[in-house]
Amino acid sequence: MGQKTNPNGLRLGIIRTWESQWYVNDKEIPNLIKEDFLIRKLINNFAKKSAISQIDIERLKEKNKNRITIFVHTAKPGVIIGKDGDTRNKLVVKLKELTQKEVNLNVLEVKNSDKIALLIAQNMAEQLENRMFFRRVQKMAIQKALKAGAKGVKTLISGRLGGAEIARSEGHAEGRVPLHTLRADIDYAAVEAHTTYGVLGIKVWIFHGEVLPGQTILDTRKPFASQSSNTPNRRPRNFKGGNNNHVNAKKN
């Protein structure tokens, strides 16, 4: 069922780790899950145009229960930090008001945003909302990701494509995206685009390479990371149709 499940969740505990790191009693788990959800929602709403790819939350020490450490991974750190750190300080104040706890906010820059699934999907959604043709949007996103060092890319857009009366799904794929291989580092994201014809669903899969014994997920995400010699090369790019790189299915 690798084709049906979320690739991020399927690989948790195998090659991926959790974005929330904390250990508490069973009674406290629901409250902290809700608190983490509200923290991420506040940060994303506060800095909508900062291209945030991931938000990590840590509560590691039992002695410091009232201390939360947050790591925000973004392609535009200057938007969150602001002039002399003013914007960051405002965000910290809002987080303290929300959680009633001490907050340590760290902003980390994402070096290569062209092969991060969430940022690619958000960029595609923005282009679709600006009425760019959906096939061109997919092809441009795939080309950028491959140039950035991705081993394989797959995209899928669903909805009233081009303003059609009947909703359908259409996608493109290039390179290898082995969803059934658990050691394969696959980044996945799903985003919605709100257009004049309705909501379009966008899904993006990025294959960074295989995490071999002795490696971590960071080794596969380096720019132009080397791949093992026994891994097949990706197939040539071809955007002129064909079953290998084109998916077209009616929505049930």
Curated annotation (Swiss-Prot):
InterPro entries: KH_dom (IPR004087), KH_dom-like_a/b (IPR015946), KH_dom_type_2 (IPR004044), KH_sf_prok-type (IPR009019), Ribosomal_S3_C_sf (IPR036419), Ribosomal_uS3_bac-typ (IPR005704), Ribosomal_uS3_C (IPR001351), Ribosomal_uS3_CS (IPR018280). Keywords: Ribonucleoprotein, Ribosomal protein, RNA-binding, rRNA-binding. GO terms for biological process: translation. The keyword RNA-binding applies. The keyword RNA-binding applies. Part of the 30S ribosomal subunit. Forms a tight complex with proteins S10 and S14. HAMAP family: Ribosomal_uS3_B. Binds the lower part of the 30S subunit head. Binds mRNA in the 70S ribosome, positioning it for translation. This is Small ribosomal subunit protein uS3. It comes from Phytoplasma sp. (strain STRAWB2).
